[in-house]
Structures are given as structure tokens and as C-alpha cells.
Amino acid sequence: MAAQCVTKVELNVSCNNLLDADVTSKSDPLCVLFLNTSGHQWYEVERTERIKNSLNPKFSKTFVIDYYFEVVQKLKFGIYDIDNKTIELSDDDFLGECEVTLGQIVSSKKLTRPLVLKNGKPAGKGSITISAEEIKDNRVVLFEMEARKLDNKDLFGKSDPYLEFHKQTSDGHWLMVHRTEVIKNNLNPMWKPFKISLNSLCYGDMDKTIKVECYDYDNDGSHDLIGTFQTTMTKLKEASRSSPVEYECINEKKRQKKKSYKNSGVISVKHCEITVECTFLDYIMGGCQLNFTVGVDFTGSNGDPSSPDSLHYISPNGVNEYLTAIWSVGLVIQDYDADKMFPAFGFGAQVPPQWQVSHEFPMNFNPSNPYCNGIQGIVEAYRTCLPQIRLYGPTNFSPIINHVARFAAAATQQQTASQYFVLLIITDGVITDLDETRQAIVNAAKLPMSIIIVGVGGADFSAMEFLDGDGGSLRAPSGEVAIRDIVQFVPFRQFQNAPKEALAQCVLAEIPQQVVGYFNTYKLLPPKNPAVK
């Protein structure tokens, strides 16, 4: 029997007194959460943001986990000093880790442990604190904020201000829950609109005190406090564009030193609105279908399928990396598609009878009906197709992305959150049409669509990591920025010794938030939502 999710738990992470791995400055730490479902293999679930030049980081990005009462959920929090832009952690300095169960965290509510090395021995210094909160509320607060006449903290140029929001815990401590972007060189900044869950902001209590701090960002990590104010949601929600709610930004040290001190600037809340966001399960249970499409790389670099060295070689027990990826992801996602008919395409091969190179040919060779019956149908189409084509090239992604995008665009005519499209591309190597693919992804980001790329074999996948917008927004050659991150890339080699479900859990981890993010952005409700009627 499948485990029933009792509730969702939000984990907030901070560290103290970390090892200093950088010679000329302090470490730039981030926290990686790993999960263990099988007993031996750990797989990565999510990462916090990287905090520059800090040995005592407080991460604003939280981890949200389904809490299962009847399952021992093993978690590992790894702390790394990040000095480059690659996704791999092997080339970053490891500062220590902490293994713990979710049950231990929730029963403690706040757990502090010393960091240990991979061999289990103490890291020498550094501790991690994990705070747990149950998420009971899907209300979010939308903010528009600006400031004027902020103090200038910089000798050359002007301050680079950003805001931090803090809520007060039951024991009186302040916990940071949101950090805005930095506005460079500006004493009258206008921050981008942002949202914070009401639970994160004030536990859903409209009269709970909220502290807002304004800082001047410094590259060396020694951010200067410009000033602070305290308020409540009751006061904040009075704000409107015609009548903003304004707060004096007060620096207590300056006020005590200077009798004539008035303030360090004024922070203006132009808009503060509470709205309810549907959850992923609200959409799924409300009738949203996930449409799954597979794209398989049949380029020559895979090697002759009849040779055991080929990535397309099917072993005597009937598997290869392509088939494993199809099974792993497909078995999870098929439950969210009512008819279980999945289109499957190949690209980069010469196809009969003309032997022209195609980058979106149906693996069942039926252009009018490229659908396969279930995941088994995709596997059978792949096996049947392989001996009938000639592996060729180049490795072009954009045709198949644009193909699925056309269906996603048609679905937007329905005005409800009725369909979402997930494209799985399995590839062995370096992408050829990078500019066209970047443009295709930027276009697809405006549609109900996500792209999963699984890299098989041992090739250099740096271009794929570039498409996965985790390090910042992807741009089209035109300069247009993707409005959301829709690409998830993982190299298959990370999962070669993992249980079969680990790959799917990793690549599908971001899908729920991408689904919710899209439908919330366009204010689309589930088809069966009572509010629609």
C-alpha cells in the first residue's frame, strides 16, 4: 500500500561557524538536500541559494517536503563552498554534512547538529540548524515595494539596497523568510513585485509582528544595515497604489549617536494583497492532465546499435540507458494521464524510405498517429524503430520542443488549467542548434510546458547545464529572458547505481512547482474547481 502524505513540512536551514575554504575571502556556501528511500543510495532533491562570503549563512530558500508518518524519511544536508557555475558538486569544497530523519526534525521542531565529514568523523567546526514548520495555509501575499532617500553606505557610487523579511518564532527569535533582489547603485529603489506565503511571513496571523530590514549589499559579504521597521499584515494590507503605506527606515545605532537623526530613508508599500494559490494536488485532483511526450536521440555519436559499446545497444536482459530513463520517468508520470497514450519521437536519424535526416519523426512511423499505448508501447516502438533507421546527425532539439509547444499553445485556448505538457528528451551529447533551442525554450516558458533532459553516456553536458536555468534566467539569442525556468537536466551517470525510482524522483521534483507556477501566473483555475462555476 502506498504511503499517505500526512502534511507538508517546510524546512529552514542556517549554519554557524563553517570551515573557511576560500583563501582570500570567506566561503560561499549553499546547502544541498539529499533523500534516501532505498537504504543505500542518496539522491539530490533541491538546493538553497548560494550566500557569498559568509561562515554563518541563513538561507532564505526553504525545502518543502511531504511528511509521511509511517515511513523513515532519511535526509542529508550537505554544505558546499561553491566557486564555479557547474552543477556538479565534485569540483566544489565540501564543508560538512548532517544525516537526520524528518521525524527527528519535526519532533524537535528545531534541531542543531555538528557537521561531519563523509567518513562520519567531525568536520572540526561548523554546525547546522534545521527548523521545521507545518504548512497549513495556501494563502500568499503579493507585494510591490519601493524606497526613497535611503542612506548612502558606499564611498564610491550609491548604496545597493535589498530587503529582508523576518518573522518571530515562538521562542522570540527572528527567522528570515524572504530576501528581495539587489538594486544596484540606487537610493530610490523600486523592487520587482514578489510574493511570500502568508504562513512563511507570519504563521497566517494577521497581527503577528513582521520585521523588515534594508541592507546595502557588499561583494565581500559584509552587508551594511541601512535601517529597519516592524509592522503587521493588518497594517500592510491597507496599502494601495493610490494610498501607499509608508514606514520610516530606522537605524538604531545612528539614532542613538545623533540627536538630529530623523530616519535612514522611507520604505513605501504600494501594493499588498492576500490571494489563495492552488496547490499541485488541487490541479491534479481538479482534472488537470499531464501530457507526456518522449524524444530520443538517434544521432551517430551513440555508436552502432549492434555493438555492445553503443548507447543504443540493448543488453541481453533487455535494457539500456535510454530504456531505463523512459521506464523510470514514464512509470511515475503515466498516472496523471487518463488515456495513457503517449507520442514518442526520434531525432537525428535518416529515416526510410527517402533516408532524409529528420528531427521529429514518430518512432512508430505513423505521422498521423504518433501515440504509443502506455510506457510499454513507447518501449516497443523504440525497439521496432531502432533496426529500421540509420543513426546520423546533427543533434537538434528545437524541432521537437516546438512540436510539443504547438500542442501546449492550443491547450491555452481552454482558459482553465486543464492540460500541462512534459517533454522528456534523452540525448547522448553536445547540442548542435543551441541558439534555436534557446529561443524555443524561451517561447515554451510562456506555455503550459516543462522539459526534462536526461543525458546518457559520458559526454560533456555543459551546454545542457546552461539550458537548465538554475544558475539564472535563460536568454534567447534576441536577448529575451525566459519568464520561468522550465528545463531540468540530469546526467544519467549520477543514477547508474541508484534504485530505479531515484532518477524519476530527481527529474520530476521540479514539475509540481512548474505546473503551479505557470497556472498561478496566468490565474488559471482547475477545470473542476468550484470557484470556476
From Swiss-Prot:
It is found in: Nucleus; Cytoplasm; Cell membrane; Cell junction. GO terms for cellular component: cell junction; cytoplasm; cytosol; focal adhesion; mitochondrion; nucleolus; nucleoplasm; nucleus. Ca(2+) 2 binds at residues 22, 81, 83, 93. SUPFAM superfamilies: C2 domain (Calcium/lipid-binding domain, CaLB), vWA-like. SMART domains: C2 (SM00239), VWA (SM00327). CDD domains: C2A_Copine, C2B_Copine, vWA_copine_like. GO terms for biological process: cellular response to calcium ion; cellular response to growth factor stimulus; ERBB2 signaling pathway; positive regulation of cell migration. Phosphorylated on serine and threonine residues. Gene3D superfamilies: C2 domain. Signal peptide: none annotated. GO terms for molecular function: calcium-dependent phospholipid binding; calcium-dependent protein binding; metal ion binding; protein serine/threonine kinase activity; receptor tyrosine kinase binding. The keyword Repeat applies. Monomer. Interacts with ERBB2 (preferentially with the tyrosine phosphorylated form); this interaction occurs at the cell membrane and is increased in a growth factor heregulin-dependent manner. Interacts with SHC1; this interaction may mediate the binding of CPNE3 with ERBB2. Interacts with RACK1. Calcium-dependent phospholipid-binding protein that plays a role in ERBB2-mediated tumor cell migration in response to growth factor heregulin stimulation. Belongs to the copine family. This is Copine-3.
